[in-house]
Amino acid sequence: MTIAHYHLPGLFEFYELYRRFLPLYRNHPEYFYDWCDIGSIYGAPADCLWGGGRVGSGESSARDVLALMRDYGISPRLTFSNSLLRAEHLRDARCNALCQMLNDGGNGGVILHSDLLLRYLQKTYPNLYFVSSTTKVLTSFPDLQAELERAEFRYVVPDFRLNHALEKLNAMPQGQKDKVEFLCNECCYFGCRDRRACYEAVSRKNLGEGGDEHRCHAPDAAAGYRFSKAMENPGFIGVADIQRTYLPMGFENFKIEGRELGSALVLEFLLYYLTKPECQLKVREEIYLDNMLDLF
């Protein structure tokens, strides 16, 4: 049976959630779909110079985080997708220490944008694998194929607006399909032309550099992320899409975004993508829901 591999958000940011969820996932397989598993969990601690995509907020100990991943056989990934790195930034002690820990663990990866950082990590930490970040905003199919041809990347995350270019995707050779990692639940406006500028603003912020704050001009931007709205996005990939379309076509890797969101919403992602509908209430009860919980 072909298995869908999910790549989940919040390696550091949602450590406490995963510390509760993963034992349940292991001990009650009957709650969860048997056609998918957890391929990796990605993220970055707060104030990481090499960080990008989103400003990291995780405060959990790296040793605790990596020990949890090791206990459950899950690949940890560092999100180091800053697109504006310069040579002097490569000396950052904290980011290097994190890479060394993943390198020593043997199954860790780095999500990145910068070729400068890629070359440095290849030379310095040979046990790491690399993921080409969606912050490259690969909206052109030829650009995606060129990125997939780069042997240094194990996976490539295209822009979500290519998710349903099914005729072109299906025509790919299997070797390229194996490397595609679809971003499933993006809430960004499908017609957005500022996505690259948004990511660059985050990169500047992580470097501590000045510059105007990026202002999103998308319709309904003030409402923030809503999963219900993401489900209406033309680029959304849902459970039925994965089972009926992408797996039969030979695609197996699916990324769930959400590092900047709250843990309650990330739990909803875990329920929707991993958990059988009839067991979702049981998972909620195991994680947080009891008969004395008040919302108001």
Segments the model singles out, each with a brief description of its role:
Residues 1-143, 147, 153-296:
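Active-site pocket-lining/capping segments in soluble small-molecule metabolic enzymes
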